[in-house]
Amino acid sequence: MKAVVLTVAVLFLTGSQARHFWQQDEPQSSWDRMKDFATVYLDAVKDSGKDYVTQFETSALGKQLNLKLLDNWDSLSSTVSKLREQIGPVTQEFWDKLEKDTVSLRQEMNKDLEEVKLKVQPYLDEFQKRWQEDVERYRQQVEPLGTELREGARQKLQELHEKLSPLGQELRDRARAHVDALRTHLAPYSDELRQRLAARLEALKESSSLADYQAKATEHLSALGEKAKPALEDLRQGLLPVLENLKMSFWSAVDEATKKLTTQ
């Protein structure tokens, strides 16, 4: 039952923080989410990519081209892992700096969320109470009909359906009325929350700290680019044998086709 109330609350509270509004645990940091996603994605690409390379090399075309992709796959995977290791610390430093610079803003927003939560909690409690009462009333009305069905014959199914339909419709109507009432009560607080968030962001936009942050972000991105250059060069060098094999196979195929045409 609590899940129903929490779901309804989320429907009426806007903003990216709404999904953490009722959470007791600390949300995962942006860096952790990005790092986990990148790791899973790259590992999946690496594993599935090797499978595709194996299938290609065992095919008729792969045997004819003889690119020897698998011979270079491990070195390429090692180069990609090295690239991740070199870029990782710089990226983590960037996210850590971002979280540190916005700690004050996040504290103020959390304070606003807590204040709004306290104001809307009575309405949520009332909604839960009325919903539970309606569900219990519906259960009491349906229970005798279930007993009647068990004791009756199959032909009474249609009669039971006719009796249940009005009760189900009544429950839906009452639930809809409760939701409408809850929406009416929560609307002012939802507007208040949006206004507070807009004010916080406007204050951040007008403050000098935003310009400082933009400069620092540019600096971090430049450092990230410099860190990535050696690893990207290693990746390019690792791809050269594959490209060279591909070029040789292409020209070999062209020469063979030319010879066949001239002999005909």
From Swiss-Prot:
One Gene Ontology cellular component: very-low-density lipoprotein particle
Family matches, as PANTHER family: APOLIPOPROTEIN (PTHR18976), APOLIPOPROTEIN A-I (PTHR18976:SF11)
Gene Ontology MF term list: cholesterol transfer activity; phosphatidylcholine-sterol O-acyltransferase activator activity; phospholipid binding; protein homodimerization activity
Residue span of region 10 X approximate tandem repeats: 67-264
Annotated InterPro entries: ApoA_E, Apolipoprotein_A1/A4/E
Annotated localization: Secreted
Renumbered ranges of Sequence repeats: 67-88, 89-110, 111-121, 122-143, 144-165, 166-187, 188-207, 208-229, 230-240, 241-264
PTM (free text): Glycosylated.
Key words, A-Z: Cholesterol metabolism, Glycoprotein, HDL, Lipid metabolism, Lipid transport, Lipoprotein, Oxidation, Palmitate, Phosphoprotein, Repeat, Secreted, Signal, Steroid metabolism, Sterol metabolism, Transport
Family: Belongs to the apolipoprotein A1/A4/E family.
An individual GO BP term: acylglycerol homeostasis
Protein name, entry field: Apolipoprotein A-I
Signal peptide feature range: 1-18
Alphabetized Gene3D superfamilies for the sequence: 1.20.5.20, 6.10.140.380, Apolipoprotein (1.20.120.20)
Subunit structure: Homodimer. Interacts with APOA1BP and CLU. Component of a sperm activating protein complex (SPAP), consisting of APOA1, an immunoglobulin heavy chain, an immunoglobulin light chain and albumin. Interacts with NDRG1. Interacts with SCGB3A2. Interacts with NAXE and YJEFN3.
Modified residues (Methionine sulfoxide): M109
UniProt gene name: APOA1
Function: Participates in the reverse transport of cholesterol from tissues to the liver for excretion by promoting cholesterol efflux from tissues and by acting as a cofactor for the lecithin cholesterol acyltransferase (LCAT). As part of the SPAP complex, activates spermatozoa motility.
